[in-house]
Amino acid sequence: MSFLVELARGAYPDNALNGFTASSQFGLDNARAMMWLSQLAYETAHRDKVKSILDAWHLTMPAFIANDPATGLPPRSACVVVAAGRGATFVTFAGSDPLKFEDWITDFNAVQSADDLHRGFADAVETVWPVIQAAIANRPAPGEPLFFTGHSLGGALAVLAAARAAHEPNVQTTVVYTFGSPRTGGSAFFNGYALGNSTFRLINGTDIVPTVPPAQPGDYRHVGQSIQCPTDGRFDGAPGQISAAAANKPDIIDGAIAAGLADIRALAAFRLIRRIGPRPLDRLAGALPRMVRDHVPANYFRALSITL
């Protein structure tokens, strides 16, 4: 990955995962732990740095896939860190890096595959699946829970990988946390997805990425339970029962209207442009439209009451 999406080593607290429990129920402490793991996947250009952070978190690293482009046309890519410990195995995918060409190809290859998946996302998971499959089969305690997570593109890849992992031997519990994830497949994938009760889709404010690919045309659907907080708000509780129609929100037009109204309120309060986080990407995002600002990882950390 590039400097735009990385954090300094000292920004990763040693106690980041101390609130984690290997539960399939939604919990804010688990969401915070998954957000830290999602951020860690952005560090795959620095294997030693990732290993150092995992050591501090009392986790091992059974598998690591850096950001070298995969072979084949069009280029496909996925960056993955598999970690183990604390009673679970974690599979975390990196999101899109603005400076990484193959990520843009993955994102925009939105033609649906024969099995009703976003082709770019499905191809990226296929590229790394043998490594993930081996890590699952060889995890320290057979049958221990699997947690899949990722921000942005990483969340979409986490959903598709979790759906595959659920069919592996000795996999009883699979939990998914995503942050600002796009839609991943059509109605057939939605209807066959068996992890809806343990898939938690967090959306910050008017984040534009969960609105794409559009629900129409193409019949793209979200899966799992939606947890959304307002712009500049906080995630503060468990998701309620959500209908299939509501779960496919947000809509890009509704989001654009909400973002515009929020910008008007912010302008009136003299806070339209504000510091978001410590990275170059965060500083750039401060001047971008709200639907983009709400997507950056720093704003998900803030919404989870984590100070970077």
Language-model-derived ranges and their functions:
Residues 1-149, 153-308:
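Non-catalytic, mobile gating and regulatory segments of ester bond hydrolases
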